[in-house]
Amino acid sequence: MDIYNFKTLLEKIQGDGMKFMKIRTRFAPSPTGYMHIGNLRTALYGYLIAKKDDGDFILRIEDTDQAREVAGAIDVIYQTLSDTGLEYDEGPDKDGGYGPYIQSQRLEIYQKYAHELVKLNGAHYCFCNQENVKGNKEDQIFKDPCHQLSDEEIEKLLSENKPYVIRQTIKQGQTTFNDEVYGEITVDNDTLDEGVLLKSDGYPTYNFANIIDDHLMSITHVVRGNEYLASTPKYNIIYQTFNWEIPTYIHVPPVMKDEQHKLSKRNGDASYQDLIKQGYLNEAVINYIALLGWAPEGEEEIFSLSELIKNFDIKRISKAPAIFDLDKLKWMNGLYLRNLTLENFHQLAMPYYQKIITRDVDLLELSQVLQLRISYLNEIPEMIDFINEPCNADETLFKNKKMKTNPENSLEALIWVRDALSTFDNFNDDLALHDLFINLAQEKEVKNGRIMYPVRVALTFKSFTPGGAVEIAHILGKNESLKRIDLAIRLLSMK
């Protein structure tokens, strides 16, 4: 019994008797760039499955495709898992006794098992060059002529240092496996390609390395995209050849941009890092991603990470593709922003203020206004661009069908307001300022909007603002508010 199987046995034996083996899931990304939404969802589901039953969540770096590796990508993986709270129990920097956890540091292990698989007739040496392979493909299923080589011919080619790969040997018959999402699946073995397991440079392919690692690391539940359903029968044949226990499979549906297209960074779709840069909160992103393919019981959709652990159920993962709805993420992120304390929101908003605002205004009051009105933090710059100076003067902004305003009656209203404000000494009291506008509307026998809307436009020259007339006037102060109202009066008087 090798050390890995011995460790597995020890984990199964607890106290006076046998218990179920501890659940161990893994997240095994390739360091090829930013964290895609689909990859992060795979990590999240693996984490939730493990933690729901007090299991272990393992990080493994699958870097066998050296040509695609991007410098700094491993650090992105570490940072993303840290920021999202998906703390792994074992990984490259947390040895749990199953390492190394980086595939490029496990080459001798893969080579050993590849050659052992050959001895078990589950794989064979292939000496074909690329042209032979292309020429022998039929309907994308490679028929390897090296099957016909005798043991003597193989030994001769090996002794001559003829370059080779090790390919899987697939015998006739059928392979059946069970998936927790898609149920029982049976395939004819003659539809399976005898793919390369070990390349001529000694590196394994993903299709081989993931099997060896999952077994040796005692992974009990494998979470991955449903694009791997087609390869799973080949994996199971290898498990069976080695007489290894097959893990529980959870294949999850793809995350789609729309009904026809998958999310793709190549096509400009947002990665996790992009969303964070746009001002979405980690907690909101994780909450939303959890719902991409999983439906909780009941109507509740807002879950903390600990609540997700408690409520997550594999049986409620859908087979259908999940559509990434940015509008819903905005809505959810807005809820998370509004649930922050004012102080915490203010801290998040301060970097935006520091880049834009030069006028001396009460920034905490500005945060109080903004917190109720934005969906994500990158909306802040457009919301506050009027603070230093009003935006480009445009008299058409004063026309509003709902408020029944136009440039002519807006001019009239602003003159009323200008006269009332000039003798108003309680500008620091926003309630008193509100009453001033309301009383003025009553005095002039007009609707409140006939006063409030022209004032709001005059103070900002924007059709959409973070607050109403009272809030904006209070933030700008009396002198600046009067200055801007005078500017609007001059503009409207020029007609």
Features from the language model and the residues they span:
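N-terminal Rossmann-like or analogous alpha/beta NTP/dinucleotide-binding catalytic cores
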Residues: D2-E138, T232-W244
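Residue-level signal for inorganic ion chemistry
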Residues: G17, G46, I77, L117, ...
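Glycine- and acidic
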Residues: T25-P31, I58-D63, M217-V222, I438, ...
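Acidic, glycine-rich active-site loops and adjacent beta-strand->loop/helix elements
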Residues: I61-D65, N226-E227, M256, L329
